[in-house]
Amino acid sequence: MPSKEFDTLPNIYLVGPMGAGKTTVGRHLAELLGREFLDSDHEIERRTGATIPWIFEKEGEIGFRSRETIVLDDLTSRRDLVLATGGGVVTQPANRSYLKTRGVVVYLYTPVELQLQRTYRDKNRPLLQVENPEQRLRDLLKLRDPLYRDVAHHIIETNQGAARELAQQILRVILSSGSH
C-alpha cells in the first residue's frame, strides 16, 4: 500500500541511455508509489500506430524527435506519473525544459559495456543498426551524458542492483532530498 507521504511527490521522469533499464525500473517505481507508469517511446508508437524503426526510416530522426516533443509535452502535463523517456529525449531543448520544470528527473547512468549487453540483439533500436554498435553507444553517451546531467535532479548508477532495488533507491533519494 503506497504511503500518504508519496501523495506530495511530483512526477518522476527517468532519463538515460538505451539499455539503462528506465522502463523496467520505472514499472517498479510506479508500483511502489501506486502511480501510473508510461514509457514515452511506447506512447509514441501507440499514438502513431507505427513502430519507432518505421518512423526513423520514413521521417528520419528529426521527424521522430518532433513527435517525441509533442508527446512529452502532453505526458509531462499530467499528474501522478512515473515516465521512462527515450534515450535521445534530452537532445531537444524543449524536452529538457519540460522534464526539468515539471517533475523530478532521475538520470540512470549506465556504463557502455552494460548498455551493449542489454541492447545487443534488440532490432527495435534504429540508432544501433550499425556495423559497430559499441562505438555508437560510446559516441551517443559522450554527446548525451552532459545533457542527462544538466537536466537531472538525481543521478543513480545502474551497474549494481536489481531493478526493484534501484526503484527503492530512487525513492529513498527523492524523499531524503526534499525534491517534493
Curated annotation (Swiss-Prot):
UniProt binding sites for Mg(2+): 23
Cofactor note: Binds 1 Mg(2+) ion per subunit.
Tagged with keyword ATP-binding: yes
GO cellular component, one term: cytosol
Transmembrane segments: none
GO molecular function list: ATP binding; magnesium ion binding; shikimate kinase activity
Protein's UniProt keywords contain Cytoplasm: yes
Cofactor names: Mg(2+)
Positions bound to ATP: 19-24, 125
Entries under Pfam families matching the protein: SKI
Amino-acid positions noted as binding substrate in the UniProt annotation, renumbered to this chain: 41, 65, 87, 144
Major localization listed first in the record, in broad terms: cytoplasm
EC number: 2.7.1.71
Compartments, as annotated in UniProt: Cytoplasm
Function of the protein: Catalyzes the specific phosphorylation of the 3-hydroxyl group of shikimic acid using ATP as a cosubstrate.
Protein name in the entry: Shikimate kinase
Native organism: Acinetobacter baylyi (strain ATCC 33305 / BD413 / ADP1)
